[in-house]
C-alpha cells in the first residue's frame, strides 16, 4: 500500500478550468468504496476506505494510515472478501461522532471510539442475512426523527432467505449489545437481477419518502435491466408498491431522485454502470431522456451543485480505467452539458464533497480496478481567488 502524494493531472473543462488529481492511497487490490469526514477535529477531511483485508482511516491532508479493522474468520457467519463493496456513515449510538457502516457479505458497523486514531474500532453486526449489498444509504424512512439504514439484498434464494429484496433497518435501542438491527423487508423478492444502488426522496408528493433502485441483468442475473421506485405506504413496515420506470436497460445501476429542471416535480438521474449511458426521467410522467449515450460503464453517481449556481449537477465515472470521469452541468432546466475532468480512472463509488474546505464540491473516488482512492479538486474557487 502506498499513500500520501499529489499527482497533478490537469483535465480541461469546456470553460478552460482544470481539476487536479490527488492520490490518497494505492493498493494491490480493488477499492470499491470511500467516505469522508473530519474524525480528528482538525478542520480537515479524513477518508475511510476498505482495502487489502482492512478498513483504514487516512488522516488528511497527509493521508497517514490508521487501521480500524482487519477482516478475518470468526467475525461473522459469512466469509469476508478483501474489501467492502459499499459503505456509509452514521452516528449509530448517538454519541455525536460518525461511525462506519460497511457491506462485506455481512453488513456491519465499526464504533468510532473517543480516541479515534488510537487503535481498532469495535466491529458489530448489523445484519448477516442481507447479502449482495451493493448500496448502503442512511435516511429517516419512517419519519420518527431517527436515522435508518437502507440496504439491498441482491443474492438469490440459494444464498439468503431474503433474495432479490430491498430492506430498511432501524437501529436497536442498545446498538452496542444487540445481535442485529431491526429489519423491514419492504420489497420482498421484488427486486430481481443484480440490484445495485438506491435513492431516497418523496416522489409523489404524499409527504412520505420513497425509495428507488436499479438492477443489471443478463444470464447470471435474470429479471434485471430495470429502473424502478417503491411507494411508501402509511405503514412503512408493510410491503411497498413497485413502480417501474423503464425496462430493457442493460447494465442499469444507479438512480437518484431530485428536481432537476426546477418545475417542482421530482425527476430521476440514472446511469447504466455495467453498460453504457447516462439518462434522466422527467417527472411527473417520468419521460426517459438520454443525456450521454456514449459513456462506458458509468458505475458511480452522485448529485451536487458543482458550479455553485443553485441547481443540481451530476458526476459519474467509468468503473474501470477505460473511459472518463465526467460531470454533467445542469442549466437549471434539465439540459445537461458533459464536462470531462479525468480519464482512465476507475470508480465504483463517487462522492461530491468539499475535500479542501474552499466552499465548492470536489470529487472523492474509490477507484475499483484502478486500485486507488483519489480526489479531484474542483477549480471553481481557485479561479475566484
PLM regions: where:
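Positively charged n-region of N-terminal signal peptides that target proteins for export
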Residues: 1-4
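Short helix-onset patch at the extreme N-terminus, typifying the N->h transition
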Residues: 6-8, 48
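Hydrophobic h-region of N-terminal signal peptides that target proteins for export
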Residues: 9-17
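Beta-propeller-forming repeat regions
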Residues: 16-385
Amino acid at each position: 500500500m502506498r499513500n500520501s502524494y499529489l499527482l497533478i493531472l490537469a483535465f480541461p473543462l469546456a470553460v478552460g478550468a482544470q481539476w487536479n488529481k490527488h492520490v490518497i492511497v494505492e493498493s494491490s487490490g480493488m477499492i470499491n468504496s470511500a467516505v469522508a469526514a473530519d474524525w480528528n477535529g482538525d478542520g480537515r477531511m479524513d477518508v475511510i476506505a476498505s482495502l487489502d483485508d482492512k478498513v483504514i482511516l487516512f488522516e488528511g491532508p497527509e493521508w497517514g494510515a490508521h487501521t480500524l479493522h482487519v477482516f478475518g474468520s470468526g467475525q461473522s457467519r459469512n466469509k469476508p472478501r478483501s474489501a467492502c463493496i459499499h459503505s456509509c456513515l452514521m452516528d449509530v449510538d448517538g454519541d455525536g461522532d460518525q461511525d462506519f457502516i460497511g457491506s462485506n457479505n455481512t453488513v456491519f458497523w465499526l464504533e468510532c471510539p473517543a480516541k479515534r486514531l488510537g487503535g481498532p474500532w469495535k466491529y458489530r453486526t448489523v445484519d448477516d442475512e442481507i447479502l449482495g449489498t451493493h448500496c448502503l444509504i442512511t435516511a429517516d424512512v419512517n419519519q420518527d426523527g431517527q436515522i435508518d439504514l437502507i440496504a439491498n439484498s441482491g443474492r438469490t434464494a440459494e444464498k439468503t432467505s431474503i433474495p432479490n429484496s430491498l430492506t430498511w433497518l432501524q437501529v436497536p435501542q442498545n446498538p452496542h449489545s444487540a445481535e442485529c438491527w431491526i429489519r423491514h423487508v419492504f420489497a420482498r423478492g421484488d427486486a430481481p437481477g443484480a440490484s445495485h444502488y438506491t435513492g431516497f426522496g418523496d416522489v409523489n408528493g404524499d409527504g412520505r419518502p420513497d425509495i428507488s433502485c436499479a438492477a443489471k441483468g443478463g444470464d447470471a442475473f435474470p429479471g434485471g435491466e430495470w429502473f424502478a421506485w417503491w411507494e411508501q405506504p402509511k405503514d412503512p413496515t408493510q410491503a411497498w408498491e413497485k413502480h417501474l420506470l423503464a425496462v430493457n436497460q442493460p447494465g442499469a445501476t444507479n438512480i437518484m431522485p431530485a428536481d432537476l429542471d426546477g418545475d417542482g416535480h421530482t425527476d430521476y438521474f440514472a446511469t447504466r454502470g455495467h453498460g453504457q449511458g447516462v439518462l434522466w426521467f422527467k417527472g411527473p410522467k417520468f419521460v426517459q431522456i438520454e443525456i450521454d449515450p456514449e459513456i462506458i460503464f458509468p458505475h458511480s453517481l452522485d448529485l451536487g451543485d458543482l458550479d455553485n449556481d443553485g441547481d443540481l449537477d451530476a458526476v459519474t465515472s467509468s468503473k474501470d480505467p477505460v473511459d472518463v470521469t465526467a460531470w454533467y452541468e445542469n442549466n437549471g432546466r434539465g439540459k445537461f452539458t458533459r464536462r470531462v475532468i479525468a480519464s482512465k480512472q476507475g470508480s465504483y463509488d463517487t462522492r461530491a464533497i468539499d475535500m479542501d474546505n474552499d466552499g465548492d464540491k470536489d470529487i472523492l473516488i474509490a477507484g475499483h480496478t484502478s486500485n486507488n482512492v483519489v480526489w479531484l479538486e474542483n477549480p471553481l474557487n481557485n479561479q475566484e481567488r
